Amino acid sequence: MQVRNILKNALFPFSCRVCGQFFHFYETNQGAPVNASAPGGLEALFQCLMAQHLCPVCARQFTAAEPPICTRCGLIFKSRQGEDHLCGDCLESEKPYGMARAAGVHDQSLMTIMHAYKYDGKVQLGGPLSKLLTAVYERHWRPGSIDLVVPVPLYPARLRKRGFNQAYLLVRSWGDVVKRDILQRTRRTAPQTGLGRKERLKNVKGAFSVKAPAAVKNRHILLVDDVYTTGATVRECARILKRCNAAQVDILTVGRAVT
C-alpha cells in the first residue's frame, strides 16, 4: 500500500490551492502534532492538516493567533513584542461577549482555504479546519466550562443555496453540546464582504433572534463562526443572547482579520 501511494503521488502530484504549484505529499514524513501544545504549536498543526492542500511554502505563510493579542476581542497585534492587553477599541467600547479567540490571521493562505471551503463547495476541508478549531478551543476553555456551542446561523434561503452551514460543520463532531436551533436568522442580509465597519453593523442589526430563550438563560455559550472581521455578526448574535439572560457569551472563529 505504501509503495502504491508513493507511485500515485509521483505520477499525480497535488496542486497548491494558493499558488497553483504542483507538489508531492508523503504521509509517512508528516509526523502530525496531536494538538496545539506540541512543538510548533498551531502553525505546525496547520501545516500538517493542510499538507494535501497547500504546498510547504504557502502552508508556512499561516500566522497563528499567538500572543500578544487583545485579552477581550482576540485582535492579533501587528507588533509581536509584549504581553496580552486590551486593544484601543476594547478600551473605548464595551463588548457584549466575554472573549473572542481564533486560530490565526485571515491572510492569503487561510483566506484561500476558507474561500474554497465556504464558496467553492470543498466541504472536505471542513475536517482539517475542524481539527484546527478544536485545538484552539482546548487551549482557551477548560473542559466542561461551556454549556452550549452555538454556530452562527445562515438565512434559510442562503442555506438552501449553499447546502451547508459552514460554522456548524466545523463543530458538529463536538457532540450534544452543539445546538444549531438556538439562534435563527430572521431576515436576509447583504454579504458582509466589501462593506465598511459601520455598514456591517447596520447590515446585521436586528437580523437574528433566539428561538429558545429559556435554553440560554444562565448558560455559558460559545458562539462559533468562520471568520471574525469587524466582529459585527458575532457581536449582534452575542447581544441578543445576553438580552435573553445568557450568563456569558464567548466567540471562537477560524480566522481573525488584522485591522
Predicted regions and their residues:
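Glycine-rich phosphate/pyrophosphate-handling loop used in enzymes and phosphotransfer proteins
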Residues: 1-225, 229-259
